[in-house]
Amino acid sequence: ITIAQTPCPQVIPALREWKGAKGTLSLPVQGNIVINPVDEAALASTASILVEDLKELMGWEYTITTGKAKKNDIYLSLAKPDEQLGKEGYVLAINNKVSIEAPTAQGVFWGTRTLLQMLHRQEAKLAKGTTRDWPEFPNRGYMLDVARKFFTLDYLKEQIKVLSFYKMNEFQIHLNDNGFPQFFDNDWNKT
């Protein structure tokens, strides 16, 4: 009997490449995010954000360490430049642990967003396999018109988290349609 490989996880935007393996990985509710020691300075912020997001999304308690990853750990590391991955691409491998590697810290961050989506959609059971993923478009964003309706700062912060979750990299806030005639002679080119 042949066991089928896992299908491509459904995330937004869709993964560019997926090579499924057999089985799933269930991460523990308490675990470690392990940073490659040579990349600690570059990836500490990403690891901290991931700890917060795992707590908020899954209710999990993760701690950040450095060193080599063990079974069920989440490992973050920078990799050599890769022309196809570019500045925002990453490789996410799921076997007996989760490994996210990318040429840049931004790529590792986007890899953590994919991991969060997979955990959310697959109810904490991750399909084993490897993805190489990179954005199709350099600018991925959203515009919010706050000139016509008031939005709280907390709402705007929440929107930034949503954008991050879906790997968008631009947030345009339309503040005002009014010029300032007393300062710029009512000239839009000067405003």
Where are these regions (language model features)?
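Aromatic- and acidic-residue-enriched carbohydrate-binding clefts of CAZyme catalytic domains
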Residues: 178-191
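Acidic, contiguous N-terminal accessory segments
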Residues: 1-135, 140
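Catalytic domains of carbohydrate-active enzymes, especially glycoside hydrolases
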Residues: 155-178
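Short strand-loop junctions, especially beta-strand C-caps/beta-turns
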Residues: 36-38, 145-147, 176
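Extracytoplasmic/secreted cell-surface and envelope-processing proteins
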Residues: 42-43, 152, 180-183
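The substrate-binding groove and active-site-proximal loops of carbohydrate-active enzymes
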Residues: 101-102, 140-153
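Conserved strand-to-helix beginnings and helix N-cap segments that scaffold or border functional pockets
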Residues: 44-47, 153-157
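Structured core elements
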Residues: 99, 143, 172-174
